[in-house]
């Protein structure tokens, strides 16, 4: 009897996992041919200062530090490299994802352009542009979304939209084109530990 229950349970788990696996395979297939660039591995003190400023009060307990992944990309064709920064950690992530910051270089440091919530990686920088900045494509999932979908975030002259899940899905036949940044696997021990600012 116990063996039969184990078989039934395993079959139910497999059946539940199949749609998720199929969606994940579909997601990977839609990025076929899109160049993938892993995040940079060296800590960047200026990026860290900008993150801490964006977070406000950042004084994590030991083991609760935020980790970050980043790439430098010229998003507005001015010859300077913005930073796309993905934050992970228990205080910054929810069921829909984590936060991604867009930072623009300014006077030897960075200023916050956008704080985009409920995001996952990779971040696709599209060749399409709006108001002089590349569109950003994210995969919206979790947080009550039963079927994930791609959305395009378009610059409005000052910032990008702050929540991908409020935007319409790209059509099922939409071709995802551009470059996928932060393409390495996000894991609990991965990324760079964000240290609190020194007082």
Regions found by a protein language model. Name each.
Residues 3-5, 9, 15, 19-42, ...:
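Acidic, small-residue rich beta-repeat scaffolds with periodic aromatic anchors
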Residues 24-64, 107-121, 161-166:
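Blade-edge motifs of beta-propeller repeat domains
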Residues 60-61, 89-95, 141-144:
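Short consensus segments that form the blades of beta-propeller domains
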Residues 66-76, 120-135:
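Beta-propeller blade termini
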Residues 77-88, 131-138:
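Acidic/hydrophobic-patterned starts of short beta strands in beta-sheet-rich repeat architectures
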Residues 88-89, 106-108, 141, 158:
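Solvent-exposed coil/turn segments that connect beta secondary-structure elements
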Residues 93-100, 145-151:
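Structural motif
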Residues 103:
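An amphipathic, basic-hydrophobic helix/alpha-beta surface used to engage anionic
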């Amino acid at each position: 009897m116990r063996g039969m229950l184990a078989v039934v349970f395993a079959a139910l788990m497999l059946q539940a996992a199949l749609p998720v696996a199929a969606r994940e395979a579909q997601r990977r297939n839609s990025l076929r041919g899109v160049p993938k660039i892993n995040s940079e591995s060296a800590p960047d003190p200026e990026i860290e200062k900008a993150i801490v400023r964006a977070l406000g009060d950042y004084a994590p307990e030991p083991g609760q530090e935020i980790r970050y992944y980043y790439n430098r990309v010229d998003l507005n064709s001015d010859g300077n490299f913005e930073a796309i920064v993905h934050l992970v950690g228990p205080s910054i992530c929810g069921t829909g994802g984590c936060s991604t910051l867009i930072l623009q270089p300014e006077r030897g440091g960075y200023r916050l352009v956008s704080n985009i919530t409920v995001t996952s990686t990779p971040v696709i920088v599209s060749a399409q542009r709006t108001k002089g900045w590349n569109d950003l494509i994210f995969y919206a999932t979790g947080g009550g979304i039963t079927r994930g979908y791609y959305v395009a975030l378009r610059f409005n002259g000052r910032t990008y939209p702050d929540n991908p899940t409020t935007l319409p899905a790209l059509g099922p036949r939409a071709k995802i084109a551009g470059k996928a940044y932060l393409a390495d696997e996000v894991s609990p021990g991965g990324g760079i530990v964000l240290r609190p600012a020194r007082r």
